[in-house]
UniProtKB/Swiss-Prot annotation:
It is found in: Plastid, Chloroplast. Gene3D superfamilies: 30s Ribosomal Protein S19, Chain A (3.30.860.10). Keywords: Chloroplast, Plastid, Ribonucleoprotein, Ribosomal protein, RNA-binding, rRNA-binding. This is Small ribosomal subunit protein uS19c. The gene is rps19. It comes from Platanus occidentalis (Sycamore).
Length: 92
């Protein structure tokens, strides 16, 4: 189910404050965050945000095409390494 249009998009308060501070200073700096549920808003465009994937922080450069998506969509949490090989020969 999508979020109601009456509500604003969710952005973590600490993340919003950091971005607004960098926008007023006109600086570019990597912002480290664990907030994967935060929605990307237009004020984030041009910033690099390091999003936690459960193991490490992946730096993601925010572009205008990402607006409206969640931060967690761009930091995959699992790596699929393929299915186990068939060991029928070794069992015989």
């Amino acid at each position: 189910m999508t979020r109601s249009l009456k509500k604003n998009p969710f952005v973590a308060n600490h993340l919003l404050r950091k971005i607004e501070k960098l926008n007023t200073k006109a600086e570019k700096e990597i912002i480290v965050t664990w907030s994967r549920a935060s929605t990307i808003i237009p004020t984030m465009i041009g910033h690099t945000i390091a999003i936690h994937n459960g193991k490490e922080h992946l730096p993601i450069y925010i572009t205008d095409r990402m607006v409206g998506h969640k931060l967690g969509e761009f930091a995959p949490t699992m790596n699929f390494r393929g299915h186990a090989k068939n060991d029928n020969r070794s069992r015989r």
